[in-house]
Design a protein with these regions (language model features):
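C-terminal extensions
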Residues: 1-141
């Protein structure tokens, strides 16, 4: 499932942007989430869940976490939901990564960036390894 679904190596968000997002307070404006522009914001607002805030989007992500749902399946469920509602294809992995890593700060083990194959990513993808991993392991907190 992970090869077709969510993959953090497909994010288009720079490490700097992701780092700023992880360090910032959530304001509630859905476009504050890296990877969400006006088109995705409209899609979220017009979906059956009427997502208009960052808090609602985080709640949607958390709603896919069941008792026997591991981190990879959880991220995939959110990714496939984003696809089903018609969000911009090239930004889905960015949105999943942004929300998952932000929530990982409060809910340890909800996201596991080490579960993805970063060795087989392209050089460009290599720049966007998990910001959570980099900050945690490089002492940038």
């Amino acid at each position: 499932m992970a090869s077709e679904g969510y993959n953090p190596n497909r994010t288009r968000v720079s490490d700097n942007t992701q780092s700023q997002w992880l360090r910032s307070n959530v304001t509630g404006t859905v476009t504050e989430v890296p990877g969400i522009g006006e088109a995705t914001a409209r899609t979220l607002e017009n979906c059956e869940d009427r997502i208009t805030t960052t808090y609602q989007l985080m709640g949607k992500f958390l709603s896919f976490k069941g008792a026997n749902v591991g981190p990879i399946e959880h991220a995939d469920r959110f990714f496939y939901w984003l696809r089903r509602i018609g969000t911009v294809a090239g930004q889905r992995s960015s949105v999943v990564r942004a929300i998952a890593e932000k929530l990982q700060l409060q809910f340890p083990d909800i996201y596991d960036p080490d579960a993805y194959d970063v060795e087989n990513s392209t050089e460009e993808d290599g720049e966007n390894k998990s910001m959570w991993y980099n900050m945690q392991n490089l002492g940038k907190w």
